């Protein structure tokens, strides 16, 4: 396939996704990869997927990738997808609180403050965990509280 054909295919696919999302309410269910997913989660997942593939490209070029505040969408994806990740890893889901510091020292929190399970730390590490993009040998800066949170960080997260 010629490069211009790939770009045209991508533009048409993107337009199709935008059209579907524009006509849908946030809670409407869509079928995606054999699963039911609401429109909001689908949109956030597509953003996370694009970010994750950008990491792959930078990795192939042996260049460092610097996250921006826009990585917040990937962080949200990780939290929204926690229950599904639990199913894939055959672990009973428990409420999870996530507290992150992102680029430009932005603070992001997801989940119930009263949760017995929490993960805190650097947003870049969290995002790489939930997209299956932790480089070999990388020491995570995430701290966990609760058995489920400890397991969650070690899950085999689906590489999107």
Language model regions located:
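C-terminal interaction segments
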Residues: 114-160
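Acidic-glycine-rich active-site phosphate/pyrophosphate-binding loop
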Residues: 22-30, 101
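Short, contiguous alpha-helical
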Residues: 32-87, 126
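Short helix-capping/linker segments at secondary-structure and domain boundaries
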Residues: 59-65, 88-90, 131-140
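Glycine/small-residue-rich hydrophobic helix-like segments
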Residues: 87-125
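Short, helix-capping/interhelical loops that line the mouth of catalytic, cofactor-
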Residues: 1-18, 22-23, 64, 69-71
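Acidic/His metal-coordination segments adjacent to aromatic residues that form catalytic metal sites
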Residues: 1-8, 29-40
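Amphipathic alpha-helix face/heptad-repeat signature
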Residues: 6-9, 13, 42-46, 74, ...
